[in-house]
Amino acid sequence: MGGPRAWTLLCLGLLLPGGGAAWSVPGARFSGRRNWCSYVVTRTVSCHVQNGTYLQRVLQNCPWPMGCPGNSYRTVVRPLYKVTYKTVTAREWRCCPGHSGVTCEEGSPGLLEPTWTDSGMRRMAVRPTALSGCLNCSKVSELTERLKALEAKVAVLSVTEQTVPSVPATPEDSALLWGSPAARGSPGDGSLQDRLDSWGLPGPTGPKGGTDSQSPVRIRGPPGPQGPPGRPGQTGAAGTPGKMGPPGPPGPPGPPGPPAPVGPPYGQVSLHGDPLLSNTFTEMGSHWPQGPTGPPGPPGPPGPMGPPGLPGPMGAPGSPGHMGIPGPSGPKGTSGHPGEKGERGLPGEPGPQGLMGVPGEPGPKGDPGEKSHWGEGLHQLREALKILAERVLILETMIGLYEPDLGSGAGPDGTGTPSLLRGKRGGHPTNYPIITPRRRSERS
């Protein structure tokens, strides 16, 4: 639930008393006044909503005096208001099931719910002008004052109804015992309690009425809809602090510090070895007695490599070593350029004549072949291709893809392109000749 409906429920929750569904007046004297129950009622109210959008035509500026053909439109917001209707949910106080009367003290044995008449429901309708701004929460104080004024009127009307002499009610007047729903507002805090003090203690319960066949039978209706959600609870106490986490990793090294101050000019540190491990200083003033020799110091770091020495004399030749393993074969080299063509050699001497061979045996006679088999097949294939080319040319001429000039001889034999097109456009049927391959006897 969000939007205006949520603001409506929030305003009603601030105005109406909180707590449970049943309302009770404190004090032992008013112990019978706790028979009020809240019911959720849905109403339709009117609101003024700003809605004034319309399309505006924008003309384009043209450099020439004539008008431009193109126009554009844009959406413009104009401060207009129109009346709309909203459905709001409110809370009303009525007698709980099983109780009746003006103050909801009279109990009924069957736990029956009150019967609301149509006239009472019409009087409880909310006027659209009463809710200014569609239940705006900025006027809470004004709504509170109006609610107190309505409670005072309800108390006055309740007192006047008690002073009216009671008459034996007929079955048609049974709805009047419940009071007017519009005249009964939500219970207040102090003003209603002060007026209840002046009424006095309730009278004794009257005798139970007899059963009558004409009396209306009241049946308990279904339960009402679920009420609005309650107010949010208070903020809980702060929890106990957690345990200390493990130490974090070491941070990066810091930047180098400033240089140390320069020492006195007479405090010369020995240049032999590390200055921090040396205790030899130049004495000034009086001479102190020489002490015993101390233990040798730790070895110093190796010095830098010196310059290479002169080459020594050549040594004696060594013994020949063993033959090594042959290495792998190298990659194949590139082919060289072809050499020049040599001179033609002298012709050789003719060889001796060979002996005449023995004649071979005659071979078997072959089968008689078919006469002009391959030639006839090739000729038929050539004729079929020629016929196919002529038919394709005829189709192209009929469709209009290829229109040869008159008298050029490009068209097929026996076909006229203008007559074909004329017959096609005029709608007259034209008998086209069907070309069939000529026989061999006809060609000869």
Swiss-Prot record:
Protein name per its UniProtKB record: EMI domain-containing protein 1
The species this protein was found in: Mus musculus (Mouse)
Feature: compositional bias, Low complexity: 232-243
Residue stretches of biased makeup (Pro residues): 222-231, 244-264, 292-311
Region (Disordered): 161-374, 404-444
Sugar-modified residues: 42, 51, 136
Keywords: Collagen, Disulfide bond, Extracellular matrix, Glycoprotein, Secreted, Signal
An example Gene Ontology CC term for this record: extracellular region
Disulfide bridge positions per record: 37-96, 62-68, 95-104
Pfam families associated with the record: Collagen, EMI
Originating gene: Emid1
Record InterPro entries: Collagen (IPR008160), Collagen/C1q_domain (IPR050392), EMI_domain (IPR011489)
Subcellular location: Secreted, Extracellular space, Extracellular matrix
Coiled coil residues, start to end: none
